[in-house]
Structure formats: C-alpha cells, structure tokens
Amino acid sequence: TDTISADTISDHAIIEVSEYILSEYKNHICAHADIPALAAQSPCGLAYALALIGTDDYQSVTPGWVLCHYPEVEHIIYMLCHTQCTDGCEYCNRMLDIHHNLKQLFGYDAFRTYDGEPLQEQASQAAVDGKSLLAIFPTGGGKSLTFQLPALMDGRTLHGLNVVISPLQSVMKDQV
C-alpha cells in the first residue's frame, strides 16, 4: 500500500487543500484551526479526523483500527473542534458557547443563580474549558445540569463517549 507522507506533499498543495477543508467544513470546525500544520504533520490522520467530523451522527466514534494506526486522530479532532479560538468564529460561538448550548440542549435562556452567584455558569464554563473543579451547590442549585451540559457538548464536538458518574438522586429519578 502507498503511504502519504508530509514529504510527498508540496507547500502549494497543502495550502490548496487547507483552503478547501476550511470552506467545506466551515460549520464543523474552528475557522482559525491551523489546517496547514495538521495537513503537513499528519495528512492521513487529518483525513480520518475529517471523515468523522463530517458525519452528522454524533454517536459515530473513531474506529479502533484507525486509533491503533493513527492515534493522532483524537488530538486532531480536539484541535479542530474543541479548541476555542480567541477571535470567536461562527463555529466556536455556536458549538463551544455554554449559553448557546444551554438554550439549544435544555431550552433555558439563562443559568440559575444562587444568592446572586452564577454557580452553574461558572462550573459549566470551567468544565468546558477543561479545568479541574470542585463545585459545591446547595440543594436545588442545578448540579445535574452542570454535569450534563459540558458532557453533552464534549460528546457533540469530539464524537466521543462521556461518562458522568453522579450519586445525585435527582439524576437517577428525573433524568434517566
């Protein structure tokens, strides 16, 4: 079998392919992702990542064979779909914004506050940003949503499985 390597691809071809990818996947990836670098470093890994990203089925996951032979695919998907740009492109504003997803996934216009503190919003944003956090909420403070929103957002952007382990009875009674 023939293998595509960065050595066999010209700079001009990488730029053309990068422009094509950005135009074809504009609603599926960050507009400011460094496609030329990814194409130069791992053209096959990028191709597999784009194949998965291009599906509308959020339950599609990376096949084991691909992960075995191209382990960088998961990192490429993360770089394209889950690394929020500083300029705020259309994709990032839609897919990585907790307020937009709160409305889209749960139908709520705003996060709940407790004594004027936006606990849900702060904890959800920290989780989406990949920060380690400990959130202590009062009863009825919205812990369930704080677990679920980031997990659902991750699943949609990364095409992965998220497991939320929670002893909360409200999750077991109301949402399962």
Task: Map each language-model feature to its residues.
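Conserved pre-motif I regulatory segment
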Residues: 91-136
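Short glycine-/small-residue-rich flexible loop motifs, especially phosphate/cofactor-binding loops
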Residues: 57, 100, 176
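N-terminal accessory nucleic-acid engagement/regulatory domains that precede
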Residues: 1-93
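Conserved P-loop/Walker A NTP-binding site and adjacent catalytic elements of P-loop NTPases
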Residues: 118-176
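A short alpha-helix capping/helix-coil boundary motif
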Residues: 78-82, 99-103, 113, 153-157
